[in-house]
Swiss-Prot record:
This is Ribonuclease Y. CDD domains: HDc (cd00077). One of its GO terms (molecular function) is RNA endonuclease activity. Residues 300-392 form the HD domain. Endoribonuclease that initiates mRNA decay. PROSITE patterns: HD.
Length: 493
């Protein structure tokens, strides 16, 4: 009986305990579920919070970028304005310097113009005032100004202007070296000479033994630029105690650098001598390059300087600004600096240079229009007269009439020596830069082919380059070969 009660009590106790255990497990599971739900909700909350923070940060960064862009745009505009102001200040500074440094401009110009020019250009004061006070508006002022004066370009055709070009800037194609320097330049078997010819792209380098100690070096090239580069390269080679093939090749490669520095020096010295203090070395280079450019036998830098002096003096006579007129004359052919072969339009090229260096409007207009017939700018008209005077005066296009005569005589002698077996007619252009040779023969046995004609042309060119008179300026030689060759279509009986 007692055992039965014990089992029942145990069963009852177990049943009660199981119920409590099940309830406990349910409570635990519910709590865990609640924790998981809370954890999930917290994670979702944090994710939204991070997303909002990222969006806010992005919006802030974007706003800062927009603000920086606006600020930079404003600063760029400020810099552009400052650049323009600096350019204006530079021009004013140059003008002020030209007034207070060295001699007054009128005195500088007086040094280069002779009395003949001043007398020919001496206007009558009463007529000058009459033109300036005229109310006739039908004719443009500058046309009335020059058409009504007793002043014609033809009266000034024979004026003399001192050549302001410093000849030491442009080295001669011929010079003398000692024997040790000759060996250094020639090298073993002429290897150094070949390297120089190849790298500098010149025709030849000729060494002539004067006596046992000295050699004459002659650079053959129709390009003054190549001659100058070769001279500068040789000069750098000779100042070294020892050179080998690699060093010579290195010097030849650096020839452009030597030449550019040389041009900058020329331009800087010329402009500063005229109280024009430009900031940019690039403009110095452009201006210095003109020392190695020729137009119909006339050195372009020398021509620009002459034109500048003449234009400035004319401006003084008619009460215009001589400093502006001087720049118009100096820079009117600046476009030729960037055109070694003469194939570009130098007025267009020059106008671009004027824009690049912020030239005054009158100067830019003159550069672009000095070859035009119809101009509406007084400084451009003055420059046209100065340009014509410089280019058209006696001997300007070949240094002198005497040199032109010598040039013609030397060319005639070269042609006659080379083409002795032909009847020849030669024509040398007035500028001295174009030589036309006609070959004539009626003899069948004197007929030559294209290769022989090419060989004759090469021989003539070599002699022209080697001659001290004919090699001063580039000359275009044209060979025209005309012959008569007759034959019968049927044999005569």
């Amino acid at each position: 009986m007692s055992a039965k009660l014990t089992l029942e009590s145990i069963a009852k106790t177990f049943a009660e305990t199981s119920i409590f255990a099940i309830l406990f497990l349910i409570i635990v599971i519910l709590n865990l579920g609640l924790l998981v739900f809370l954890a999930y909700q917290y994670r979702v909350y944090k994710k939204k919070q991070r997303a909002n923070l990222t969006k806010q940060t992005y919006n802030n960064d974007y706003g800062q970028i927009v603000n920086l862009k606006q600020q930079n745009g404003a600063k760029i505009k400020e810099l552009a304005n400052l650049k323009d102001q600096l350019s204006e200040l530079g021009q004013k500074f140059n003008t002020t310097l030209s007034e207070i440094i060295n001699k007054p401009l009128v005195n500088v110009i007086d040094e280069y113009l002779d009395e003949q020019f001043k007398q020919a250009a001496n206007f009558r004061e009463a007529e000058l005032n009459a033109v300036l006070d005229s109310n006739d508006q039908k004719t443009v002022f500058h046309k009335r100004l020059f058409n009504k004066f007793h002043f014609g370009v033809d009266k000034l055709a024979n004026i003399n202007v001192k050549n302001p070009l410093n000849l030491c800037w442009v080295d001669s194609a011929s010079f003398t070296v000692i024997e040790s320097d000759f060996r250094k330049l020639n090298g073993v078997g002429g290897i150094n000479k070949k390297l120089l010819i190849e790298k500098l792209r010149i025709e030849d380098i000729i060494f002539t033994n004067i006596d046992k100690k000295y050699y004459e070096v002659q650079i053959l090239s129709d390009s003054p630029v190549k001659v100058q580069k070769t001279v500068l390269t040789i000069r750098n080679i000779l100042i070294n105690d020892y050179v080998d093939n690699e060093k010579i090749e290195s010097y030849a490669r650096e020839a452009n650098g030597y030449f550019n520095d040389h041009c900058k020096l020329i331009g800087k010295q010329v402009l500063e001598r005229l109280n024009i203090f430009e900031i940019s070395p690039k403009l110095h280079k452009f201006f210095g390059l003109l020392a190695f450019r020729y137009s119909f036998g006339q050195n372009v830098l020398s021509h620009c300087l002459e034109t500048g002096f003449l234009t400035a003096y004319l401006a003084l006579l008619v009460n215009f600004k001589p400093d502006v007129a001087l720049k118009c004359g100096l820079y009117h052919d600046i476009g030729k600096a960037d055109d070694e072969n003469g194939k570009k339009n130098h007025t267009v090229t020059g106008a671009k240079i004027g824009d690049e260096f912020y030239f005054e409007n009158d100067v830019k207009y003159t550069i672009a229009n000095h070859h035009n017939k119809n101009v509406d700018n007084v400084y451009c008209r003055l420059t046209q007269i100065g340009d014509k005077l410089s280019a058209g005066r006696l001997g300007a296009r070949s240094d002198s009439s005497v040199l032109f005569s010598q040039l013609k005589q030397e060319l005639k002698q070269i042609v006659e020596e080379t083409l002795a077996q032909f009847k020849t007619t030669i024509l040398l252009g007035q500028s001295g830069r174009r030589l036309v040779i006609w070959l004539e023969t009626n003899q069948h046995n004197n007929i030559i082919d294209n290769q022989q004609l090419t060989d004759l042309a090469t021989t003539i060119k070599s002699k022209i380059v080697q001659n001290n008179i004919t090699n001063r300026f580039p000359i275009k030689v044209v060979l025209r070969y005309n012959f008569e060759h007759s034959f019968d279509t049927k044999d005569k009986n």
